[in-house]
Amino acid sequence: EEKVGLRSLILEKFSKELLIEIYKLVKDWSVDNNNKRDILFDILNQYNIQYYPIGSGTNRYAALIDGYIFKFALDADGMIDNKREFKYCLPMQPYVIKTYEVLPDGLIAVCEYVELMTIDEFNDSRVRSKMRKILDDIGDSYFIGDIGIDAKNYTNWGWRKNTQEIL
C-alpha cells in the first residue's frame, strides 16, 4: 500500500513556540485588532519570519510569505473566517481564492496569491458585468457578506495569476 505524505506550509514556517505566541495574542481581549496587527509584526520579526505586509480586514491580517498569502486571525471571528474559507473554497471554484491549508483552530490559513484589482479595473463596465455574474452564480448557494460591487469592496476583488479569471 502506497503512503501519501502531506506537507504543511504553516508547520514548515512556524515553530510551535511561534504559534503559541500568535495564539496568545489572538486570545488577548484587552488588545484591539489594530494594535494586534502591530504586535503580530513584532512577533514575526522576533522569529525572523520574512514577510511582505498585504493588509488588514476586520478580523484578520494578510501577509505574503514565499509566494503564498498567510491569513492570521486577529480574534475568534477571524479564526472562524479562516475555517469557513477553507471549507467553502472548493465548491466555490473558480470564483474565490484557493485556500490550501488552515490550522484546525483557524489561527492561520494559507491561500493563493492573486493580483488585486485597481480601482480603475474595478470600475470598468465589462469587469463589473463579470462581477455581477459571479455574485449571481455564488449568491444562489452561498451567503457572501463582505463582497459586492460597491467601491468600498474593491480590495476584495483580484485576478488569478496568468489568467483573466476574476476572483
Predicted segment positions?
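Short, surface-exposed coil-to-beta transition loops
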Residues: G57-T58, P104, K152-Y154
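ATP-binding glycine-rich loop module of kinase domains
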Residues: Q50-I97
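Conserved structural core of kinase catalytic domains
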Residues: P94-L135
